[in-house]
Amino acid sequence: ALAIAVPVTVVSAIGAATKFGVVIKSGAAFERLGGIRHLAVDKTGTLTRNRPEVTAIVAAHGFDDAQVLAWAAAVEQHSTHPLAAAIAAAGRGTPAAQDVAEEAGHGIGGLVDGRRVAVGSPRWIDAGPLKARVEDLEAEGQTCVLVTVDGFLAGAIGVRDELRPEVPEVVRTLRDQGVEVSMLTGDNSRTAAALAKLAGIGDVHAELRPEDKARIVAGFSETSPTAMIGDGINDAPALAGATV
């Protein structure tokens, strides 16, 4: 009777999960989930609402806000990064760039009206005279990207994606059940720390590349069963290396 009851229970649970938008690929994965002792989570689009909005534009000397946004939107239309959609939407109507190339974890570049435009993180592009302003925005919980035109710094754009309201309670519940929670993000340490504080997450790993996330998750998995929750192509290696 037990041999029959267990599969039925698992199938029933998998069916119930689909009603909440959760797709479980196999009963084995469902069973492994019960033994998870460590949860690694991405920030953007996972802990946050996935409704990013442009909240600040800072133009460098000789440029203006509208120019900076238009150039950034032209190349970000081609990006798969969760925050790119916010910039593209804010600059709606901007012609798309040509000859676009994206490097995961760094940024994206292309030709806009014959000018070479690049949009990327402050780790990839030097903030120069805008460094102090960028750091202030990051400390407020905004994610900043820098925009260059023909190799010259044109400006910075701040994007904010609010924390999902249920996250603090979920983190507390997991901790009460003996599950450690860690944040893994490619974002800067200031923005990550600001959001982690709101979420109640104490273990924060920021400024990570996709391979860094995969390495950290592999390390977690060596000591305890680990689940990874992520979003986007940047998290694919880490997702593949997790227990679930």
Language-model regions, residue ranges each:
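General structural feature for long, well-ordered alpha-helical segments within catalytic domains
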Residues: 10, 32-35, 53, 83, ...
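Cytosolic catalytic regions of ATP/NTP-dependent phosphoryl-transfer enzymes
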Residues: 38-128, 142-154, 188-197, 234, ...
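Conserved catalytic phosphorylation-site environment of P-type ATPases
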Residues: 2-75, 218-222, 230, 238
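Conserved ATP-binding TGD loop and adjacent catalytic N/P-domain core of P-type ATPases
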Residues: 24, 114, 133, 141-143, ...
